[in-house]
Amino acid sequence: MVDAVKADPFGKVNAIDVLDLASLEARAEKVLGRGEFGYISEGSDDGYTMHRNTTAFQDVHMLPRVLQGVENPDQSTTFMGAKLASPLLTAPIASNTLAHPSGELGLAKGAKEAGIMMSQSTFASKTIAETAAVSDGAPYMFQLYMPKDWEYCQYLLDEAKQAGALAIILTADSTLGGYREKDVMNHYHLKGRLANLEGYNTGQSGVGAGGLFKESMQKLDLGLISKLASYSGLPIIIKGIQHPADAVAAITAGAAGIYVSNHGGRQLDGAPGAIEQLPAIAAAVDHRVPIIFDGGVQRGTHVLKALALGADLVGIGRPFSYGLALGGWQGVKDVADHLKMEINIAMQLTGCQTMADVKQMKVKTTFA
């Protein structure tokens, strides 16, 4: 006899009409709690860097080619051996159940259905194993906030490796949280599970997620790269690189990838837009390791600009959270599909048949 029907782990799912990624924020605000929306949407301090992430794309101009014989552009690519339908990544975000009950499960399924890369935060609301079961072999990376407790770190690395993670993304720019005024005004404390921490401590649910960075090490150094690589046997990608010298130092210390990011403008306010730093960092990397980029991406043209300036994979954060809030995993897929549609149009109109063509596309900027 079949057991009683179990609760659907993906919760309520529905298709969403995506006009553009920017308009998703106002729609998501209507379905999210005030505190949850504030936590997801805000940047640190005055929000300059968060907004500059997007506006800086206006200072990058693509130089289209015509009569190139382009038809039905192919945006598929590979990253660290993983085949992807598009060079997109769900950037690591903490506690996705703030947006939707399915949390990382919905994010993973949406990414899998869209054929893009998924990454999971240390501070996820679902365990690595739970998320991996949904990913079911789809490309996946694990983002690590370096714990103070080395045994806990080993536990996370073991879980990630068993789950089939392609790489470990070590976040280096968030040894503590930026000052976020909406959280203060809303008296907001992050709700829900820190599933990976509870899995290590008790294996049970119910551990609150207050004091998000309490378990994280503040004094990070380059020696961690070889330590993590040696223990895990996985490639280590350093996230939060904003200076060319840091990229060079990380590669020299054994980093297998560089992740250009300012944490969505949620950490140090007053830093440049992430895209402004990408050309110099890409020049310093000089094709030695792959580059991931995130920061303010809201258009398919933004993706092409980042790729042309040196990125190999482009991360999207808040828009996927909003898609998840509005439609569960289907909303995540719909956001990805809309972005892929915009990428396809931009490739056709710039004369790019493949991602290799995009990488060779000429662009003009005011900062490179």
From Swiss-Prot:
Cofactor: FMN
EC assignment: 1.1.3.-
Residues annotated as binding FMN: 92-94, 121, 143, 171, 239, 261, 294-298, 318
GO molecular function terms listed in the Swiss-Prot or TrEMBL record: (S)-2-hydroxy-acid oxidase activity; FMN binding
Reactions catalysed, as given in the entry: (S)-lactate + O2 = pyruvate + H2O2; 2-hydroxyoctanoate + O2 = 2-oxooctanoate + H2O2
Keyword Cell membrane: no
Domain FMN hydroxy acid dehydrogenase: 13-368
Broadest EC class assigned to this enzyme: oxidoreductase
Binding of pyruvate, residues: 39, 145, 180, 263, 266
Cofactor note: Binds 1 FMN per subunit.
UniProtKB keywords: Flavoprotein, FMN, Oxidoreductase
Active site (catalytic residues): 263 (proton acceptor)
Pfam families found in the cross-reference section: FMN_dh
The keyword Flavoprotein appears for this protein: yes
Coiled-coil intervals, chain numbering: none
Function: Catalyzes the oxidation of (S)-lactate (L-lactate) to pyruvate, with a reduction of O2 to H2O2. To a lesser extent is also able to use 2-hydroxyoctanoate as substrate. May be involved in the utilization of L-lactate as an energy source for growth.
PANTHER family: 2-HYDROXYACID OXIDASE 1 (PTHR10578:SF107), S -2-HYDROXY-ACID OXIDASE-RELATED (PTHR10578)
Assembly and interaction partners: Homotetramer.
Similarity annotation: Belongs to the FMN-dependent alpha-hydroxy acid dehydrogenase family.
Protein name in UniProt: L-lactate oxidase
